[in-house]
Amino acid sequence: MCTNCKKPYYISTAIAYTSGKPHIGNTYEIVLADAIARYKREQGYDVYFQTGTDEHGQKIELKAADAGVTPKEFVDGVAGQIKEIWDLMNTSYDKFIRTTDDYHEKQVQKIFKKLYDQGDIYKGHYEGLYCTPCESFWTPSQVVDGKCPDCGRPVQPAKEEAYFFRMSKYAPKLIEYINEHPEFIQPVSRKNEMMNNFLLPGLQDLCVSRTSFKWGIPVTFDPKHVTYVWLDALTNYITGIGYDCDGNSDEKFKKYWPADLHLIGKDIIRFHTIYWPIFLMALGLPLPKQVFGHPWLLQGDGKMSKSKGNVLYADTLVDFFGVDAVRYFVLHEMPFENDGVISWDLMVERMNSDLANILGNLVNRTVSMTNKYFGGIVENKGAAEPVDEELKATVLETVKKVDEKMNKLRVADAITEIFNIFRRSNKYIDETTPWTLAKDEAKKDRLATVLYNLTEAITIGASLLFSFMPQTSEKILAQLNTEKRSLENMNTFGLYPNGNKVTEKPEILFARMDIKDVMEKVEAMKAAAAAENKEEKKEEEKPGMDVEKKPEITYDDFAKLQFQIGEIVKCEEVPKSKKLLCSQVKIGSETRQILSGIKAWYKPEDMVGRKVMVVTNLKPAKLAGMLSEGMILCAEDDEGNLALMTPAKDVKSGSEVC
C-alpha cells in the first residue's frame, strides 16, 4: 500500500453551452471551481479539475445555419472563445473536454446501447411542448402563458418518435439515497426543492433521443435518432476521465471516480441531482459525493442575458481592473446560497477600499519602512509587547477559519477571513506607530520586531490568498523575497527567515480608481458601440425609414429595391473599427466594395468564397471614412447575433433575388 500517495480529489464545473461568448456570470463558476481546486491542492490532495463545452443540440444547429457555417465550425469558434476566457482568468483546470471529442461520442453511443439492452431505455413517441433555448420538454400543466418555466421564452408544440429512459424505475432508490446522504445536494434549500417539486410528486420517464434535428451523437442501432442532451452532456464527467462501459476504463477513472464535487449553477441542479444520479445507478456506478448548486451573479435588474442588454464580459472587466481584481470581486461578492450583484460602482469601491487600501497600501508601507529604517533587512529582535500576541492570534485563528470555511465551500467567507489578517495588520501599524519608534535609537529593536511581525503576517496572508488571487499572492511574496508557505507551516508564526532582505522598490499592487473616470470610459465605450451600430444601421436601412415603427409600403416601393447574389472575393478588417468588415463582392461582371457590421461573428478569411444576398441599388455611402456600394443582408436572432443571408443552393453571382 502506498503510504505517501496523495488522496485524489475530482472537481468539475458544468460544461458551458457553445451558443455564444460566456458573460461574467458564467465565468464566476470556473473561477469558483478554480479557487476550490487550488485550495485542495494546498491541502495536499491530488486534484483533477475538469471543465469543458457542451456542443450538440437543436439550438446550435439553428445558430450554425443562421451563421452560414456547419455546426462543427460554429462550435469550434465558440469553444475556442470560452477556453480563451477560462485561460484569461488564470484557471488551473486539468482537462477541457468537448462533447464533440471522438472518444466522448463513442462512449455515449456505447452507454446508450448498454442502457437500451438492459431495458432502461425504450422506444415511444413524444407529444408536448418544447423550449429550444433550454432544450427542455414540458407538459401543458407545467407551462404558464405559453412560456418556458425555466427561461420564460415561448415554447413550441412538439411531436416525434423518441427513446425514453425509465426514470420512474429508479426514483425510489434515489429518494432513499438522498435521505441517507444529506451532504449530496448543497445548499440544503436546493435539496428540498428537488425532493418536494420533482421526486416526491413522481418522476416521468425522460426523453433521451431526438429525430427533429441532426446535430447530435447518432444512436448506433437507429441512426435517424440522435442522443438528446442529457445522456450526452452529463456523461462528460465520466468519459473525460476514461470511463468505458465495456469494463475497460482507464486507471484515471478508477482513481478519481466518484467525483468529490460537481459545481454547477442552481438553474441546472435538477439535471445533476435527478437525471445524472439515476443514469449512474443504471450503469452500476457510484454517485458523486456532492453536487453544489451555486447562486447567480446578477447585474442590478436581474440575471444577465444578451436579450436584456445587461451583459458584462470577463475580458472587458479585466481590461479595466485586472485579472485578480475581477477574481476577488466575484469570489467575495457571491454568498453561499443567495444571488450576488455586480456593478461598476461596487467594483470600483472594492478596488479602492479592499485591494488598493487594505491590501496594497499595507504591503507598500511595510516594504517601504523596512527599506527606510533597516536597508530592507527583516529581523526579529525579540522586543515583544502584548499587542504582538493579538496580531499573532488573529493570523493563526484565521488559518484555521479559512480551512473550515473552504471545507464547507463557503468561499466568500474564506476570502473575507483572509482580508481580516490584512485589516488587523493595518491596525497593528496604527497601534505600534513605527515612524515614532524610528525616532528613538533605544527602540530600534522594537521597531525591527514590529516590521518582522508585519512581514510574517503578510507572508501568511499572501500564502492563503494564493488559491483566490494567485498572481497577487506571487507578487506580494516576491516583494517580501520569500516562498509561499504551506498550510501546515502557516500554523506557526515566526518562520520568516531572520536577516532576509525585501525588495528595494515596492510594486504598486492595485491603483486607486476614480468612479467618475471609470464611468466616463464605460459610457464612451457604450457610446462608441452605439454610434457604430447606428452608422451601420443607417446604411443598412432605407433612408427616412422609422426604425422603431416601420411604415407600410406599397409593392411599387418594394420593387424599387434590387436584390442580387454576390460572391465575396476579398475581405479585410476596417482600421479603427470594432465592428466593420470591408468586402470586395463580385456581382455578375462587376466587383463592389461593401462594408458590413459583422466583425463580431465572421473572420475576414471565413468570408471569402461565400455567396450572399446584396441590395445593389442603394446610393453609395461612407462608413468609417470608406465608401460602401451596397448592403449585405443579414438576419438577427433574439440575442443580437447576426447571420448572413445565403442562397440554399449554389447560384451564379449576379443572379437576381425575386
Question: What residue spans do the PLM features occupy?
Answer:
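Cys/His-rich short segments
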Residues: 118-171, 175
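Phosphate-backbone binding interfaces of nucleic-acid-interacting proteins
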Residues: 536-658
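Intrinsic disorder at enzyme termini
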Residues: 476-557
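Helix-rich, typically C-terminal accessory recognition domains appended to large enzymatic cores
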Residues: 123, 346-383, 394-502, 615
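A glycine-rich helix N-cap at a beta->alpha junction
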Residues: 78-94
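Structured secondary-structure scaffolds
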Residues: 2-51, 103-107, 151, 157-372, ...
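N-terminal catalytic cores of NTP/NDP-binding nucleotidyl/phosphoryl-transfer enzymes
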Residues: 2-78, 97-112, 117, 134, ...
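Short secondary-structure capping/junction motifs at helix and strand boundaries
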Residues: 89-98, 116-129, 141-142, 156-159, ...
